[in-house]
Amino acid sequence: MKKFTKLKGIAALFADINIDTDAIIPKQFLKTIEREGLGKNLFYDQRYEKDYEEKPEFILNIEPWKKAKIIIAGDNFGCGSSREHAPWALLDFGIECIISTSFADIFYNNSVKNGLLPITLKKDDINVLTDLAFKKEILTINLKEDLISVRDINISFNIDKIVKNRLINGYDDIELTLKNESLIEQYEKNKDKFFDWKYIE
């Protein structure tokens, strides 16, 4: 998994609340287990008329937000059904960070497991970033310092230490397991000491 330390890019604004996973990647695109190519189907119903004809008013069809790396979203982003394709599609499009006041738990966990950084901020900080996004300002996100910077504006954020370590080092589930392989082996060798086993013949 790609390591996440620092990100610099423009932010696209999705102000609606409760943007669900079906809006992010509709169900007809869930048949594949391939991650590449899903980006073109991101926000399909809002982004296209038919046959991938772009709706000119949609934010990701407008320069410079066509190249957005960050989304500033309304409350409860990623709600709805569980589908790992949602972070896959966002990442394949080029989105590497979502900033919101809140996330659906399953979407949050799926994002972290795939290297997509979800940042939770207070509403006042979201409002500041929203104004900057309208002005097409470049945001810098420094995960090591838990800091979002735009010119002379600095906004700090809190993130779970385990999540932070995982993203900075690019650990997926398998890599996390292998990292603790010696501890797992030690446990397996000594687990009989921890439990009062009764064997029945």
Locate the predicted segments by residue:
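Cytosolic catalytic domains that perform sulfur/thiol-centered chemistry
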Residues: 1-74, 78-81, 85-105, 109-110, ...
